[in-house]
Amino acid sequence: MLFDNKNRGALNSLNTPDIASLSISSMSDYHVFDFPGKDLQREEVIDLLDQQGFIPDDLIEQEVDWFYNSLGIDDLFFSRESPQLISNIIHSLYASKLDFFAKSKFNGIQPRLFSIKNKIITNDNHAIFMESNTGVSISDSQQKNFKFASDAVGNDTLEHGKDTIKKNRIEMDDSCPPYELDSEIDDLFLDNKSQKNCRLVSFWAPESELKLTFVYESVYPNDDPAGVDISSQDLLKGDIESISDKTMYKVSSNENKKLYGLLLKLVKEREGPVIKTTRSVENKDEIRLLVAYKRFTTKRYYSALNSLFHYYKLKPSKFYLESFNVKDDDIIIFSVYLNENQQLEDVLLHDVEAALKQVEREASLLYAIPNNSFHEVYQRRQFSPKEAIYAHIGAIFINHFVNRLGSDYQNLLSQITIKRNDTTLLEIVENLKRKLRNETLTQQTIINIMSKHYTIISKLYKNFAQIHYYHNSTKDMEKTLSFQRLEKVEPFKNDQEFEAYLNKFIPNDSPDLLILKTLNIFNKSILKTNFFITRKVAISFRLDPSLVMTKFEYPETPYGIFFVVGNTFKGFHIRFRDIARGGIRIVCSRNQDIYDLNSKNVIDENYQLASTQQRKNKDIPEGGSKGVILLNPGLVEHDQTFVAFSQYVDAMIDILINDPLKENYVNLLPKEEILFFGPDEGTAGFVDWATNHARVRNCPWWKSFLTGKSPSLGGIPHDEYGMTSLGVRAYVNKIYETLNLTNSTVYKFQTGGPDGDLGSNEILLSSPNECYLAILDGSGVLCDPKGLDKDELCRLAHERKMISDFDTSKLSNNGFFVSVDAMDIMLPNGTIVANGTTFRNTFHTQIFKFVDHVDIFVPCGGRPNSITLNNLHYFVDEKTGKCKIPYIVEGANLFITQPAKNALEEHGCILFKDASANKGGVTSSSMEVLASLALNDNDFVHKFIGDVSGERSALYKSYVVEVQSRIQKNAELEFGQLWNLNQLNGTHISEISNQLSFTINKLNDDLVASQELWLNDLKLRNYLLLDKIIPKILIDVAGPQSVLENIPESYLKVLLSSYLSSTFVYQNGIDVNIGKFLEFIGGLKREAEASA
């Protein structure tokens, strides 16, 4: 159970060893492996090379000796490899040497000594990677091997090559890229979900830049794919055999096992990587970098870390990668050894340890974003790692927040008057807006412009760092290499200097100006960030919405915006009030084209969802908010979405609390803030984790952080109790009741299938008079013009299965199911479906090709803006001008754009929009929080949640019924007011819905701002709270006085104001007449007097 603290004290009291005392030396940490058969194997290799005849006889032994004795490869490698494989490696290396001399002679250039890039992958998931790099020196022993070459190409060429190599030894070429095969190791082994855990060892030849990497599939004592559970006590004692690769465990010292056990414990306790640097106890010239993290929580991290060594011109001697088969999470540990006496001279000037400390700091940054869009600028060392990540994030920000429309578009709209029924002009304007947004300043254009102006980006980065890098004194900063580099950059003193600089170097009609100015706006909008916190899983920013969202495009400025960038996603969170509630949705894209479309719309979608939520939340104390996480293309699996969600949440928490286990951050906000999340598309299964995680991170508001939790945590699952669907169904049923359709057959179309919350409950709650004609969901399209079997649909809904599991034997001759994976199939009416996904995505506009008519359409799923002015004509009868679907209840948020809603109603459709129909879930969430606030912890755990057996308490069951009743009541009240006002003045229902929400929210804000009722009429205040607002069953448990003491005063105020505002408007309409309001309050006062 969530409240069980029995294990926490024991773990905290464990005697945690010091990492510095456990790293002895590379020779001691890993035992020297004795391979008795090495000499015999060596002779077999010589024989094989001799038989093959590629290497001259008098050079074979020298080449073999060099490989066996000069590259620093330990005997463990030789014991595991066959003579055939070793001979192949030696052939590859020898061929590269020949290549050097041939190019020196014929091209007149001095190429790298070992210009080699080769990989060998065997059938047993074993691989060897060989790659050279610049900065190669040439040893005397190697020169003996090349005596033949001097005869062939001449001593002058050889001597010239040696001089060049010697020069490179002193100063590594800044333009040289890091090892390119490192990213292939990531892709083939570390990030490949079909690949089992592996063990990796890399060796750098002491006198060259030749890197040899050996990868082996890990072998565990207990090869359980689910991993092995292991206690913290065992980890700290180094008892890790059950989760370790057999070879690693065999060759590791006891100290090394304890060290790895400690790192594993630290990784299990918190999110993100554990990164440590220590000197070896026995070899003071040796420094060891250790990085531990959960596998699949980042991508291309191995290559990113190696590129960091390259950037700081550090040369490791050995790189070990160990994988551990831990329950729930495979954990990877990098163990990298560096010797000071093997480093380049210019590295020694600024201290190897200082460089490694900088690597330690930036390894956390690269864990969050291992691949950035400015890799080439970074490789040229024109950007530091931090500058490259800053530019990467800045480019994403610019792509989403740059004002592409400009003043010309705004001036155009000010010169024309668009009537709401002029769909042609509305469509032209919408198309122009979309074209301006989609076809100007692509992401790549932004990146190219920023790369060109890298010096300006560096100056803006310094402006950003000067504000947000938290430090006690400049003296502390001067110790880091990044500060020493930053000190050389002159920032912009103010906006005037920035503008003058741009005007001096960039033409005034260049798009570069807009890009760079938007990056400056990004800097100014940042109120807090975790960018400089070392242990982070993604990078988060709290932005000032007044600076990044123009009034022209976003008429109502939000209260706050969060912006999060991770290695597999970008995320946003928009809220319209300080205390606000809304779900977090995940948007997946199966391919790049879909991703590009989703990316273009994500900010508008997030804003519209949050705005809709603000209107939906008119009945509850909290304002509206919404979060959207957009995953990189192709990431659609459950575990991939969870990683993104968990990193999004953790990064947000970083800048919501002051975590004593992390560094401080600069907070430019005048007060602390709290966010309240809820489930939405793709995140319903993650809310329990987020609740527990907030508790683990000691968030004081963890109980109310997430709603829709499992009942064992005090949550009320929306899907299990149909909370959202109850509101939608109330509107459907009221339409039938009002228009006398209850006993008439109604033909129905639904998007969102029986596997989802809204779709399944809509099926289960459907009335007997409804006949389903078509349903579509993530698996495809199910349609039957003669009606779908209701019992079969209910079976799928109960089992939460997709329509792909529908028993097609129960379809008529004209019925069909088309999978999203289908291609080139013929339907019963002769229609050819070329692509199943395209057919599914457009079926809602094509349905009348397969059915004669539809009476009611209930969208319960689907992408926002699925019906727009651009496809409106599919829903309008050309002959009559009437809407082909007479009734629409928009259960899915934003399924229909507001202009399209107006147009549909103009053509006679009776349409109830999302902000009215889809508000049951937020009511449930709000009342879930109310229960946790009204009851003390003891009552909440033992009386509300109940025992640990899973049986829900009587109080819980009664409260659920209370919540369901309130949802239906609020929906029916709003329906009545919407219907009456529509009948009274003919205003479109969707417009009245907006006016209703605005009126309630405005009155609510005015009442919150006023202290009159709260301070001066305690009798009325307490009567309303205890008799009208807070459910009686909670008061019966806690007592009236305790309830009022348990709930924070600020929350009681908004409880009172939201009740008064919504109740008044539902009774009196959208005209807030002061006389009517006084009468309303007077009536409540008389009720309070009568009840006294």
Curated annotation (Swiss-Prot):
GO terms for cellular component: cytosol; mitochondrion. GO terms for molecular function: glutamate dehydrogenase (NAD+) activity. It catalyses: L-glutamate + NAD(+) + H2O = 2-oxoglutarate + NH4(+) + NADH + H(+). Its EC number is 1.4.1.2. Keywords: NAD, Oxidoreductase, Phosphoprotein. Disruption phenotype: Leads to rapamycin resistance when grown on glutamate as the sole nitrogen source. Phosphorylated by a complex containing the NNK1 kinase. One of its GO terms (biological process) is glutamate catabolic process. The active site is at K626. PANTHER family: GLUTAMATE DEHYDROGENASE, NAD-SPECIFIC GLUTAMATE DEHYDROGENASE. Homotetramer. Interacts with NNK1. Belongs to the Glu/Leu/Phe/Val dehydrogenases family. NAD(+)-dependent glutamate dehydrogenase which degrades glutamate to ammonia and alpha-ketoglutarate. Present with 7400 molecules/cell in log phase SD medium. This is NAD-specific glutamate dehydrogenase. It comes from Saccharomyces cerevisiae (strain ATCC 204508 / S288c) (Baker's yeast). The lineage of its organism: Eukaryota, Fungi, Dikarya, Ascomycota, Saccharomycotina.
